[in-house]
């Protein structure tokens, strides 16, 4: 007798989930995690400056492009291409967010943002102030970092290729789970950057 049975959709999703768990995400033991975390620390220890193009994907799926500059420790510039009018800078202590079209400036304490993790004077993930988790997904090292005492800052997720060991992407996940993804392209490492690029724009005072 021939049986004609339809496999439930829920069972198909369940089997796909099991497949991805076993074949997509590598099991990472404690020693492997420690070794990979040390690799990330060494990457930032040896990173003096970074200049790169980026593509940003917002939680709604909207994309923006621009240039990013890092000069560690402490200095950051994220300069968006038009039609995005946003400029983000930091020289330590504050993140300055400016809208060039509106000529507006907002200052946010650095330690209230995930950027504080990247801009530390000495990055140490074996730190009671951080909650750190690591996994490998299809050959990509994924490091998830939260500030233990400031959950309002959200979560920073760093993704690295293994060979060569390079930063490819970071994701900022907020308290409600919305993610902003930044893809790094055409990176140049450890080249001298002018200090002045980390200053915010100087908008003229409005006329009374």
Question: Language-model features: where?
Answer:
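Solvent-exposed strand-loop boundary residues in beta-sheet-rich modules
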Residues: 58-60, 101-103, 176
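Boundary at the C-terminal end of the N-terminal hydrophobic targeting segment
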Residues: 28-32
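Bacterial N-terminal signal peptides that target proteins for export
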Residues: 2-15
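Gly/Pro-enriched, hydrophobic low-complexity segments
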Residues: 126-207
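A short, Trp-centered hydrophobic/proline-enriched beta-strand micro-motif
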Residues: 42-61
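Bacterial N-terminal signal peptides
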Residues: 12-24
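Short, solvent-exposed helix-to-loop capping segments enriched in aromatics
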Residues: 44, 112-126
């Amino acid at each position: 007798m021939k049986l004609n049975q339809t496999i439930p959709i829920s069972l198909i999703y369940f089997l796909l989930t099991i497949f991805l768990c076993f074949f997509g995400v590598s099991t990472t033991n404690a020693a492997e995690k420690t070794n990979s975390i040390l690799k990330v620390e060494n990457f930032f220890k040896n990173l003096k400056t970074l200049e790169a193009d980026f593509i940003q994907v917002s939680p709604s799926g909207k994309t923006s492009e621009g240039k990013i500059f890092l000069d560690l420790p402490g200095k950051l510039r994220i300069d968006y291409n038009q039609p995005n009018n946003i400029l983000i800078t930091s020289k330590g202590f504050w993140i300055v967010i400016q809208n060039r079209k509106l000529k507006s400036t907002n200052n946010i304490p650095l330690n209230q943002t995930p950027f504080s993790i990247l801009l530390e004077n000495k990055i140490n993930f074996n730190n009671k102030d951080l909650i750190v988790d690591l996994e490998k997904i299809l050959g990509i090292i994924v490091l998830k970092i939260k500030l233990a005492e400031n959950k309002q800052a959200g979560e920073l997720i760093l993704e690295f290729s293994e060979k060569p060991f390079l930063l490819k992407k970071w994701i900022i996940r907020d308290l409600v789970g919305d993610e902003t993804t930044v893809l790094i392209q055409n990176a140049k490492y450890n080249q001298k950057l002018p200090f002045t690029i980390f200053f915010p724009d100087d908008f003229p005072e409005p006329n009374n």
